[in-house]
Amino acid sequence: MYKTESFKPDTFKPARFESDGKITLSGKEIPYHTICEDNVIYGPDGNPVASIFTYAYFRSDVEDTADRPVVFAYNGGPGSSCMYVHAGFLGTRRMQYDEVDRESAFGPYKVIDNPDCLIAIADIVLIDPVGTGYGVLIDESKKKDFFGIEQDAEALLTVLEAWVRRYNRGLSPKYLCGESYGCTRSAVAAGIAATMGRERGYGIAFDGIVFIGNTVTVGKYFGEGLPVETSVLGFPTYAGVNWYHNHPTDQSVEDFVKEAKAFADHDYVLALYKGEAISEEEKEHILEKVSYYTGVSREYLIRHGLKIDDDDYRQEVLKTKGKAVSRYDGRVTRPLLEPEQDEIKKALWDDATADRYDTFFYAAFTGDLLPNLNVKLDRNFIPGTDYYMHWDKEEKKGTTAEELRYAMTRRPGMRAFFANGWFDLCTEFGYAWHTMDHAGLPKDRVFWKGYQSGHMIYLGEDNVHELCSDIRDFILGKNPKSQF
């Protein structure tokens, strides 16, 4: 990766920036103070090896913080900075959203005071993991110490412990909020904190976790090694995307998806289990129903043994209209190219959502949020990397779902809130439902809700209002109205 600066253990200088601001929420002016800084991690020899960069928002008119929650938030990847959740819905400034399927990736972009900001009820800490955003891997020889499921989680815990001591927040309620792979990070970090790390224990506990675009499963690594057909787990999302574009029914998306799931849980999964032993009558029934619910053609289903491949689905559902749908948001489309040029599976994702929004987020974050935070850092800001290509996926203690179960059983008051988009083809909500059915989680403390969105639930003014309201209620101890 090319950079315009080079860091070495003997020359790295930690950065720290402070600012003050005010925001009006529900008619009340709220003052806040921000501290953006490097959180340096040192090796056994005392030399700095890496830094996790944090952007902290403190409400400055609160004197006693013992009962004031702190929300620690990040994106996923692995290899993504916190830019998306920061500029998307958690900062005091955020993007102003327009239509979902915007035609151009170019400006003008609008950034506004965030009317839904959680600063009214909680302090907020946004986190750039090592090697992302302004986070830095200082010693390049130490990649294996940070770029892996457990390594990443322990680096986070190391920094959070130090941050909590530094700002005297040991008594404050603490919440994790992760998006996408950030859900994996949250579950593993909470599990390790409740039990034991590779070499040490941690003195931090979490009151709750918000999972946005869930990646916590009973499999080895998201969808790997799951004892169920992925076509069945993805089926409810396929139905949601088909409902949005092809309008097969007058039902609401919730009712249509619920009906599709009931079919997938019984007739469809049984047909896939039978395989070639299925009768012609049964096969016709399955072909008709699967095509109706998902929008995929009979011809495709016959060629693929009634199964649906995730990559193929994005090309198939609107094939007759000459369009492909986005992996990150099935509502967003682009022209369908020739098959030999289209997608080039596993090598190129020409994703319509990323095409439209990545530049928007970067412009908003670097052009507005950073100046407002008084961050003046002559360092490459890395929105995202390909660390996931080289990530250590080994989990010595079990699956991500097991880590979450460890945390919730050892911390009896801990709660979990899963938020998923009906049109998210990246982390399909069927996986979250499967996790909640098979992970042994305490059901009275686990909540799920679907949103009229894709992977990034906060895209769209209605969605960002709803999501922030639900998270606010969750932090205040109210149980979200679970749709699961």
Predicted regions and their residues:
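Short alpha-helix in the alpha/beta-hydrolase fold that links the catalytic acid
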Residues: 414, 428-438
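Alpha/beta-hydrolase fold catalytic core
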Residues: 275-426
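Alpha/beta-hydrolase fold nucleophile elbow
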Residues: 169-181
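N-terminal cap/lid subdomain of alpha/beta-hydrolase-fold enzymes
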Residues: 2-4, 46-145
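Catalytic histidine neighborhood in serine/cysteine hydrolases
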Residues: 440-456
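A catalytic-pocket lid/entrance helix-loop region that shapes and gates access to the active site
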Residues: 94-96, 190, 194-293
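Alpha/beta-hydrolase active-site loop
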Residues: 119-120, 129, 146-166
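Catalytic histidine-centered segment of alpha/beta-hydrolase-like enzymes
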Residues: 454-464
